């Protein structure tokens, strides 16, 4: 009996029964999550949150003040102070001008308006401006209009293009070079003939851009070209004079020179 009592731990507990069970406790309990249905999720997401309602400030009407320079109204003093930077020409600082500033401006304006008196010079300037405004506008009749006349039928046209189109109707005349401008300068005079006494030839003085040689009658466009051409005739004349033994550029010899030359020739002949 002693062995059985020592081995059983519940032997000392009175009223202990073998049918009593102790509750079991879990060391790591887990919380259950409740799943929301689709209807509950849609209703919760679509429902708007209430926005805070801002009530108007009863003192806002007292804060809003107009600008003393331009009259614009602003809802806050901060905006009004920022707007006053747009008026740097004012002589005072802040929102409201000083009390004596308005009276001084009014007095200056009244004194300036009463003391202003137009001078005689200003009266003259005003009268001149009125005369210029009421004067007649000068017409363009005094201007000379350029006109072009057709040589074939003597019709007058106001432009060179109109005359060119008209000249196309004349089949006997090619081009429009026969037209004449009424306002152009008169034609140059005909060439004059001058007789050269040394050579007995007539020299023509041709006016205009054409330059004619008086020896071979060749025409050149410029005086420089004619001068270069004339050197050919001068060189030919010099060659002919050298062949004849007479140089026109050297002065004639005296009687003493001729006798000396003859004596020298005689001596050389011996």
UniProtKB/Swiss-Prot annotation:
Residues 1-64, 95-119 are annotated as: Disordered. One of its GO terms (cellular component) is nucleus. A zinc finger (C2H2-type) spans 65-87, 148-170, 211-233. Keywords: Metal-binding, Nucleus, Repeat, Transcription, Transcription regulation, Zinc, Zinc-finger. One of its GO terms (biological process) is regulation of DNA-templated transcription. Interacts (via the EAR motif) with TPL. Expressed exclusively in pollen. Induction: Activated by the transcription factor DUO1. Its main location: nucleus. The gene is ZAT2. It is found in: Nucleus. This is Zinc finger protein ZAT2. It comes from the Eukaryota. Residues 1-28, 36-48 have a biased composition (Polar residues). GO terms for molecular function: DNA-binding transcription factor activity; zinc ion binding. Mediates the regulation of male germ cell division by DUO1. It comes from Arabidopsis thaliana. It holds the Pfam family zf-C2H2_6.
């Amino acid at each position: 009996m002693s062995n059985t009592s020592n081995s059983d731990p519940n032997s000392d507990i009175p009223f202990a029964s073998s049918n009593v069970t102790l509750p079991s406790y879990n060391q790591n309990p887990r919380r259950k999550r409740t799943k929301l249905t689709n209807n509950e999720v849609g209703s919760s997401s679509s429902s708007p949150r209430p926005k805070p309602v801002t009530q108007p400030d009863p003192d806002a009407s007292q804060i809003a003040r107009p600008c003393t320079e331009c009259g614009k109204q602003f809802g806050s003093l901060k905006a009004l102070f920022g707007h006053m930077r747009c008026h740097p020409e004012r002589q005072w600082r802040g929102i409201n001008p000083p009390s004596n500033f308005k009276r001084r401006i009014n007095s200056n304006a009244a004194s300036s308006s009463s003391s202003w008196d137009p001078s005689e010079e200003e009266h003259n300037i005003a009268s001149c401006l009125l005369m210029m405004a009421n004067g007649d506008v000068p017409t363009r009749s005094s201007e000379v209009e350029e006109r072009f006349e057709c040589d074939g039928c003597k019709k007058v046209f106001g432009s060179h293009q109109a005359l060119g189109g008209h000249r196309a109707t004349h089949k006997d005349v090619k081009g429009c070079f026969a037209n004449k401008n009424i306002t152009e300068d008169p034609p140059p005079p005909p060439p004059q003939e001058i007789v050269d006494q040394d050579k007995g030839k007539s020299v023509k003085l041709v006016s205009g851009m054409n330059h004619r040689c008086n020896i071979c009658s060749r025409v050149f466009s410029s005086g420089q070209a004619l001068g270069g051409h004339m050197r050919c005739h001068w060189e030919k004349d010099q060659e002919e004079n050298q062949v004849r033994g007479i140089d026109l550029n050297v002065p004639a010899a005296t009687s003493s020179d001729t006798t000396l030359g003859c004596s020298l020739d005689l001596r050389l002949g011996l």
